[in-house]
Structures are given as C-alpha cells and as structure tokens.
UniProtKB/Swiss-Prot annotation:
Family of the protein in this entry: Belongs to the DMRL synthase family.
Source organism of this protein record: Brucella abortus (strain 2308)
Keywords: Cytoplasm, Riboflavin biosynthesis, Transferase, Virulence
Disruption phenotype annotation: Cells lacking this gene are not auxotrophic for riboflavin and grow at wild-type rates in both rich and minimal media. But simultaneous disruption of ribH1 and ribH2 is lethal. The ribH2 mutant shows a decrease in survival and replication in macrophages at all time-points and is attenuated in mice.
Induction: The two ribH genes may be differentially expressed during the Brucella infection cycle. Brucella would use RibH1 for flavin biosynthesis during the extracellular phase and RibH2 during intracellular growth.
Protein's name according to its UniProt entry: 6,7-dimethyl-8-ribityllumazine synthase 2
Subunit record text: Homodecamer, arranged as a dimer of pentamers.
Length: 158
C-alpha cells in the first residue's frame, strides 16, 4: 500500500497509548500533543486511541495506517518486568510489529514504547519514569514532524 504523506502543513497523527501504567504513559501523550501544538500553531491534529497494553499496539497501528488518514502513528507504552513473564520478549514483539507495520503500509510508526531494565513500584522509580516519558513525548513530536516533512519531500520527487 503506497500512502504519501500530506504535502500541506495540516495533517493528522494517530497516538496509540497502552493503559497499563497509564499515569506514566499519559505523560508522553500530554507532552507530545503540547509540543506539536507549540511547534505548529495547532495545525497538526492528534487523534488518541487507547489499547489495553503494549502488545495490542501493532495491530491497532496497522488498522489505522490502512485508513490513509494519518501522516504518522505513534505508539506509547511502558513494558516492565512484572515477575511473571519476560517483559523483553513482549517489548521485542511490539517493536518488531511496529516496524513491520510501517514497512508494509509506508506510514511512519514511531515508538515511545519503553522497557526499563528494572522498575520497582517506588516513588523514586515512578517519579523518574514519569519525567522520562515527558521527555520522550517531546522527542516523538520532533521525530514525527521531521519524518512527515521528509516523507513529503520524497513524495514530491516521485
């Protein structure tokens, strides 16, 4: 499926957020939306989609990419070691799935799916990752603007 990015200043980005550790993941979304608004004067529309966990992000991203409505898609989740399963397997599956979606649909899929080596339900860890997700949201906004711009530039060459 060949989908070109919009060749205009106004476009849409889908933001898919996992609801596990929502209080932390929400910080990425809030800073992402705020940074896009600050950088574009509100010309970029962000549509928010909730999924139960990180594992559901790739399928949701693929479904949204196929609509042709979005110049880019962002997935955000916090995959931690809960002591029951190997969280790194889940994170790898999610990231690989997101990569596959963008390669198949030609819609950029950006990741704010973070997997710490260790996370403990302590105030110190919570505060650290709360702040870290804010930073990652801003970084994702910059990356989204850059990749949409570059994709538009490439589309103009074809």
């Amino acid at each position: 499926m060949n989908q070109s990015c919009p060749n205009k200043t106004s476009f849409k980005i889908a933001f898919i957020q996992a609801r596990w550790h929502a209080d932390i993941v929400d910080e990425a979304r809030k800073s992402f939306v705020a940074e896009l608004a600050a950088k574009t004067g509100g010309s970029v529309e962000v549509e928010i989609f909730d999924v139960p966990g990180a594992y559901e992000i790739p399928l949701h991203a693929k479904t949204l990419a196929r609509t042709g409505r979005y110049a880019a898609i962002v997935g955000a989740a916090f995959v931690i070691d809960g002591g029951i399963y190997r969280h790194d397997f889940v994170a790898t599956a999610v990231i690989n799935g997101m990569m596959q979606v963008q390669l198949e649909t030609e819609v950029p899929v950006l990741s704010v799916v973070l997997t710490p080596h260790h996370f403990h339900e302590s105030k110190e860890h919570h505060d650290f990752f709360h702040a870290h997700f804010k930073v990652k949201g801003v970084e994702a906004a910059h990356a989204a603007l850059q990749i949409v711009s570059e994709r538009s530039r490439i589309a103009a060459l074809v």
